[in-house]
Curated annotation (Swiss-Prot):
Pfam families: PLAC8. Expressed in roots, coleoptiles, leaves, stalks, apical meristems, immature ears, endosperm, pericarp and tassel spikelets. Keywords: Membrane, Transmembrane, Transmembrane helix. The chain crosses the membrane at residues 52-74. Belongs to the cornifelin family. It is found in: Membrane. PANTHER family: DUF614 FAMILY PROTEIN-RELATED (PTHR15907). This is Cell number regulator 4. One of its GO terms (cellular component) is membrane. InterPro entries: PLAC_motif_containing (IPR006461). Signal peptide: none annotated. Its main location: membrane.
Amino acid sequence: MSTYPPPTGEWTTGLCGCFSDCKSCCLSFLCPCIPFGQVAEVLDKGMTSCGLAGLLYCLLLHAGVAVVPCHCIYTCTYRRKLRAAYDLPPEPCADCCVHMWCGPCAISQMYRELKNRGADPAMGRQPAFSLSLTSHCRFFLKSKYYHIIKKNWRTVKYG
């Protein structure tokens, strides 16, 4: 049985197809900073770490509650990057509207889209067979030595 990559120009799952991947669904609704950070890391090709993107999302989420939903503007920029990368249509409506009214569903859809296209956000930017230090954001949040570990890991790994 051979598998073909999904065609460019169309989404592999719908906005409300959250239950096709229970992990991304639960994370997107209970702790959206984690799947969003993973998506941002993949879309930025490692230039933004999972932890940093997730932390910024949380700060914007709580800072903008009273005035403007700042996190929607931040997350819709990544939806635009994803759409540009795979030539996806703005469905079901404009990117900012999707993130404003269906934020967790939109984050879950972005996560699933990358996963269905072969770039598993849970693995970070690394190939599936290698250990990724930024894959679950644990090191960023728990270790004060994160940057030293990451620098040494890249030195050993890429030599």
